[in-house]
Design a protein with these regions (language model features):
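N-terminal/domain-start alpha-helical segments
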Residues: 1-114
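Residue-level preference for short helical/loop micro-motifs built around acidic side chains
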Residues: 9, 56-59, 171, 203, ...
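Glycine-rich nucleotide-binding loop
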Residues: 30, 206-210
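The C-terminal output helix
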Residues: 109-121, 161
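Short boundary/linker motifs that mark transitions into or out of structured domains
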Residues: 125-135, 207, 215
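Positively charged, aromatic-enriched patches within helix-turn-helix-type DNA-binding elements
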Residues: 135, 140-200, 205-207
Length: 215
């Protein structure tokens, strides 16, 4: 959530190049709508937003027991501002200007801390997925997936036995405004089957894709 177009665009592009799916909004109301309709791993939040401030949005989320990790990104660099942000529920605080590599490192650190608060592992048969560390194993052997292969597999594993439509999967893999090739989902499904086994993902014709509830 960033109202500065130069910062917002550069962060969005940098994170997408690192394999993240990123939605960028410019004010709190749009952020509220996005959070109400989409599941996110993390919120990057500027404090100096038009209308409702970032601090007000953060406090509102925490009052509603929203547990999404929040990394505050702001030009406010006084000790008092940092304390206020952290006390309002931020997980970390990064002062502008910043390096994108440092942003990525802080994001990973926040996600690791959140992963330690509960068992994040998704398990189905001999398949194990850790969304916090982006690790996948089968029979204890690591499986290397791209960021979008991981996101697609995670969406399917979260609802085993339930077919998900192509449109639903595209929502998980791509941010708002990103161009989606017509056969993108099929390409990622083919790659996942090659790595996990032909029967690991099934196609329910006219409905969507699913992972069997038992593997």
């Amino acid at each position: 959530v960033e109202d500065d177009p130069m910062i917002g665009k550069s962060v969005q592009q940098g994170l997408r190049q690192d394999g993240h799916t990123v939605d960028w909004v410019r004010e709190s109301r749009a952020a509220e709508l996005a959070l109400a309709t989409t599941s996110y791993e993390m919120l990057l939040l500027d404090l100096g937003l038009p209308g409702k401030s970032g601090l007000e949005l953060l406090a509102q989320l925490r009052r509603a027991a929203h547990r999404i990790p929040v990394l505050v990104i702001t030009a406010r660099d006084s000790v008092a501002d940092r304390i206020l942000g952290l006390d309002s529920g931020a997980d970390d605080y990064l002062v502008k200007p910043f390096d994108l590599d440092e942003l990525g490192a802080r994001m990973r650190a926040v996600l690791r801390r959140h992963a330690g608060r509960a068992d994040p592992v998704i398990a189905l048969g001999d398949l194990r997925m850790n969304p916090a560390t982006h690790e996948v194993t089968r029979n204890g052997q690591p499986i290397v997936l791209s960021a979008r292969e991981f996101a697609l597999l995670q969406a399917l594993l979260e609802q085993p036995g339930v077919p998900l439509s192509r449109a639903r999967l595209e929502e998980r893999l791509y941010g708002w405004g990103e161009e989606v090739e017509s056969n993108a989902i099929e390409v990622y499904i083919h790659s996942l089957r090659r790595k996990l086994g032909a029967e690991s993902i099934r196609n329910i014709r006219g409905v969507g894709y699913l992972v069997p509830a038992s593997q």
